[in-house]
Amino acid sequence: MMKGYAGALLRKSRLYRRITEWDWTAFGLARSALEKHAGRPLEGARVLDLGCGPRFPALLLFHTFGARATGIDTEVVDPAFGEGAGLRMIRRHGFARFLKSLARGVLFDRGYYRELRRRAERPLLFRGLDIRRMDARALDFPDAHFYLVHSNSVLEHLEDVPRALYELARTLKPGGVASVVIHLFPSLSGGHLLEWAYPDEDLPRAAPPWDHLLENRFPASVPLNRWRERDFRRELEKRFELVEVERYREGERYLTPERERALSAWSREELTTRAFRALLRRR
């Protein structure tokens, strides 16, 4: 099990520049949205990173650039990963999870953070990070608390999206903004297989394109709600004004006429749209 995981990490380590580029871009878009549409500088603003993840890149950047930022996730790796953090993780998530986190730190995270620091052009501020274990369906924050809510590739993993959006809207200040990126399930990378994370990269691949929509011989190791863009937009528009929508494309060269016929339940637009970003204001 660990051998396969280490091999996946080694492949992923070759992609950390791409992953960092995506995370840096998402941070920059959220920062610009706050300044342009809420009229506030990032420094000193209360910011929520919804689903900050084990590397917490957006939270780290918000904190480094002076925001009063909080990150939440259902499972969080201690920023100061060491002996004490390892013991806490073993108690909380088990020894296998601890080994995976340790391997990720050695094989991937160091290079990732070096690249993130290069893009930020300043030291990354790990000290004082506010990371909390919390369910997006029950945010333990007051009403109208945050000027900015950021979420990058999180909502596609949630079972109860409407409840999470209710909580997001509740905790967002009037006049505040949310910057939400959603990775779409029908896309080529939507099955969350590491080998298809970046389809334009030349990597060895066992799964055929869009296998997750057909035979699904390589099921995702993370929960996916399988929503389509129209499902997300329907729920977003109930609680927010959509100020901007931007789409990111991928996979055109893999969508042969034969594959398109096999995937006729989805439109070409759905199959070749990796993700969309919505800039939101609370209604």
Predicted region positions:
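Conserved alpha-helix/loop element of class I SAM-dependent methyltransferases that forms part
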Residues: 23-44
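Acceptor-substrate binding/catalytic loop of class I
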Residues: 186, 215-231
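A short acidic, Gly/Pro-enriched loop at the edge of an enzyme's catalytic core
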Residues: 134-149
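A C-terminal cap/extension of S-adenosyl-L-methionine-dependent methyltransferases
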Residues: 224, 230-283
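Conserved class I S-adenosyl-L-methionine
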Residues: 43-53, 70, 177-208
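A short glycine-rich, Lys/Arg-flanked "PGG" loop and its adjoining helix->strand segment in the class I
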Residues: 162-177
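Class I SAM-dependent methyltransferase SAM/SAH-binding core
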Residues: 57-138
